[in-house]
Amino acid sequence: VPKHIPLFSIFALLSLWSVALPAQSQALLPYTLQMDAKELEQQGLSLTQDAVQLARFQQYELAMQRAQLATQLAPKSFQTWFLLGSLYIQTEKLDQGIEALQTARSLAPKEASILFSLGSARFQKGQYSAAVADLQTGLKLKPDVPEALFDLGNAYYKLNQFPQAIAQYQKAVNKDAKFWPAINNIGLVKYETGDVNGAIQYWRNASSLDDKAAEPRLATAVALYAKGDKEQGLALGEAAIKLDSRYADLKFLEENLWGNRLLKETQKFLETPRIKETVANSQGEPAQPEVVPQ
């Protein structure tokens, strides 16, 4: 699965802010209308909700325009900067996103969601130690958020701090037993550290929670094939690739935190005639994106 959860903070937390909106919806007010600071702020906050709705339908450019205007109308409201920063990150403008999120943090230093988003952005930039620091600070303010624990586990994993990574993934699972991406990633760590049987067990557990989850199925297939259980491995691998052919791409797997050991075995697996044929037959078929539990 994608190793960050885009727009989680926007969609999950804007609904909790209970933003007070003007009595009547107004797209753009006449410039001649005199408005006090409070009215301007309300208009800015109203625009943030418009932007969120646009982002839900992946209309990011339109959402960005409204978010930018919202920061001008309500520059002292952390919500507007938080939304703008999150949209920048979603569109891979990471430096601008971090700058906007830092502004949001200066306005609301106790808002954990800002720190979670900063941690995610720093992770995407490869600043793993900084990501750990932001995520840890956020979790002190708001503990037991599965997505944040998952991100923290990923940052530790990239720093090769494997026990810490597993601990954070396990905390995420303890909070949400159906959060299979964390279970899957424990398997990734186990495999890289030589515990093949342990990895397979975690991947099978992850697969049991979502019958559309291609990643843990393919990982299990590769591990079984490498162990010598070739027929079962090939059959499971075929099924996984039919679910989502993106996982037949080594670069995509690396982006999803598959380690060197597993990638090496996967390369061999993908070169087998049966899997090559499955991949070829899957070309052009629309992938069924895995659904991250909310």
Model-derived features: positions:
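Terminal, low-structured helical/coil segments at or just beyond the last alpha-helical repeat
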Residues: Q26-L40, A239-Q294
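Structural signature of tandem alpha-helical TPR/SEL1-like repeats
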Residues: R56-R66, Q90-T103, Q124-T137, K158-K171, ...
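TPR/TPR-like (Sel1-like) alpha-helical repeat modules
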Residues: R204, S208, A214, L218-D249, ...
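Helix-start (N-cap) detector for alpha-helical repeat units in TPR-like alpha-solenoids
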Residues: A37, G44, F78-Q79, A112-S113, ...
